[in-house]
């Protein structure tokens, strides 16, 4: 083991690695409490669910198929859609007058 390797070991990770990890965590890590519900079209929801059944939680592959969406955005959508923790937010959205695809609103629209 020569002297340069010893110096490198003593110094720890390079500045480039620490900058990368710091910027990655600063940009992507957000507390789940601060998440806003992500609205997707029916086509996007269908595509995401089919892709998830096909490839699992490989969000990069799924994001490659959904135009204009990032992998972390799709992952957050999936977590919020399928997690018990966010069920109260979904219920609140379904009861709002602006959300027109709830079963009650569909029945009312059919009667008209």
Swiss-Prot record:
InterPro entries per UniProt: Homeodomain-like_sf, Myb_TF_plants, SANT/Myb
Q: Where in the cell is it found?
A: Nucleus
- One Pfam family name is Myb_DNA-binding
User: Where are the membrane-spanning stretches?
Assistant: none
Q: Outline the extent of the Myb-like domain.
A: 41-78
What's the superkingdom here?
Eukaryota
Q: Which GO terms describe its cellular component?
A: nucleus
**Expressing tissues:** Expressed in stomatal guard mother cells, young stomata and trichomes of young leaves, and inflorescences.
Q: Name one GO molecular function term.
A: DNA-binding transcription factor activity
Name of the protein in question: MYB-like transcription factor ETC2
Q: Which organism is it from?
A: Arabidopsis thaliana (Mouse-ear cress)
């Amino acid at each position: 083991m020569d002297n340069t390797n010893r110096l490198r070991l003593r110094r720890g990770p390079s500045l480039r690695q620490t900058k990368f990890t710091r910027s990655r965590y600063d940009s992507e890590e957000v507390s789940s409490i601060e998440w806003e519900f992500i609205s997707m079209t029916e086509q996007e929801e269908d595509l995401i669910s089919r892709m998830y059944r096909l490839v699992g939680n490989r969000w990069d592959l799924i994001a490659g198929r959904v135009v204009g969406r990032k992998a972390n955005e799709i992952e957050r959508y999936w977590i919020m859609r399928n997690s018990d923790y966010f069920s109260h937010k979904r219920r609140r959205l379904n009861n709002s007058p602006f959300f027109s695809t709830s079963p009650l609103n569909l029945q009312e629209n059919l009667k008209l």
